[in-house]
A protein has these predicted regions:
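Short histidine-centered beta-strand/loop micro-motifs
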Residues: 68-74, 115-117
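Short acidic-glycine-tyrosine-enriched beta hairpin
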Residues: 46, 92-108
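Hydrophobic packing within well-folded, soluble alpha/beta domains
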Residues: 2-6, 16, 82, 114, ...
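Ligand-binding loop in jelly-roll beta-barrel domains
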Residues: 41, 99-100, 108-133
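Short, conserved beta-strand element in jelly-roll/cupin
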Residues: 61-62, 72-89
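Structural motif
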Residues: 79, 86-88, 95, 111, ...
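A short, N-terminal "cap"/entry segment at the start of jelly-roll beta-barrel domains
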Residues: 1-54
Length: 133
C-alpha cells in the first residue's frame, strides 16, 4: 500500500505530503541591512539570511584613505569584485592592488585587511565562506 511505501522511505504520511517551503531566491534593497562604521565605511548584507548558508555576500563601500577592520586568520575563503575605485588587499605582509573591474580571491589563513588608498570611495562585492559577519 501507499502507507507501506512511505514507511519504507523512512518518513510519515504527513511529512511525505507536506508542501516544502520555497527558498527565497531574489532579494531586494528593502531587505538589506547596513552597518556604517566611525570612518563612514558601509557594509550591506545583500542576502539578509546568509548566515544560514555557506556563503555571505556583502556590498561594501570603503571611504578614501580608510580601511576595514583587520581580520584574524580563519578557515574559509574570501572573494571580491571591485565595482568602482581601488583597493589594497593585504594578506600578512603582502599587498595586492585591485582596481575597478578586477577581482580578488584568497584563503583566509593569514591576517588580512582591505583598505582604500584612493581619493574616491571604493565599492565592491565581497563574498566570504563561511559567513563571517
Amino acid at each position: 500500500t501507499l502507507l507501506d511505501l512511505i514507511e519504507c522511505l523512512g518518513t510519515t504520511a504527513a511529512d511525505f505530503f507536506k508542501e516544502t517551503e520555497e527558498e527565497q531566491v531574489v532579494f531586494s534593497e528593502q531587505g538589506y541591512f547596513e552597518k556604517i562604521d566611525e570612518a563612514g565605511n558601509s557594509i550591506q548584507w545583500i542576502v539578509p539570511t546568509a548566515q544560514r548558508y555557506r556563503m555571505e555576500p556583502l556590498l561594501v563601500v570603503v571611504q578614501p584613505h580608510q580601511s576595514l577592520e583587520e581580520d584574524k586568520p580563519h578557515d574559509g575563503e574570501e572573494f571580491g569584485y571591485v565595482m568602482s575605485g581601488r583597493l589594497n588587499v593585504i594578506l600578512g605582509e603582502q599587498i595586492y592592488h585591485v582596481k575597478a573591474g578586477e577581482s580578488f580571491y584568497y584563503p583566509a589563513k593569514k591576517i588580512h585587511r582591505i583598505e582604500n588608498p584612493g581619493q574616491r570611495p571604493a565599492k565592491f562585492i565581497w563574498v566570504s565562506t563561511p559567513p563571517m559577519f
